[in-house]
Amino acid sequence: MTKQMTDKEKHKEAMDFGPVYTQFEGKTKDAMLHLCIVKTGICIHAFKRDDIGDVDIAWGQPNDPTTGKGGYGLSHILTDHGEEIKDFNFDPIDFILLVLNFGKLNSQGKKNRIYLEGKDYRLIVTTEWYGVKQQLLLTAFDLRPVSRKNPQRAREMRKAPKR
């Protein structure tokens, strides 16, 4: 019999990113490369931009394979959106750096979210994590419609019988 987690237990688990790395403050690429090696933890203030302030980067977790939801952080971006990013002919780490540095700030989105974007991509930083004020890299992804992302898949979808 499995015990249901209380809200307090869920909050504690969500806040437990693992080891806290402070030596990568302002060293975004080094922070991401380190997290790719250790696959756990959070790098505090790894990125800073004048219009949004400091951003922490956590290893996080990929989407739940059964629901396709719930992922966050660098692990989520690399696992769940890495192939989309490679379609832009960028290494995912370099792509994240590019968007963090040069993406246009769009503050018209959801509450507690910062959107940095271009014509075909979006990176999201959350400003609150389970009720705690913290700017954390959440996700990055391709905004192109399926037909432009993956023309082969779009052709297959058009050929599929209608239900």
Residue ranges with predicted function:
Residues 1-163:
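Ribonuclease/tRNase effector modules and their secretory precursors
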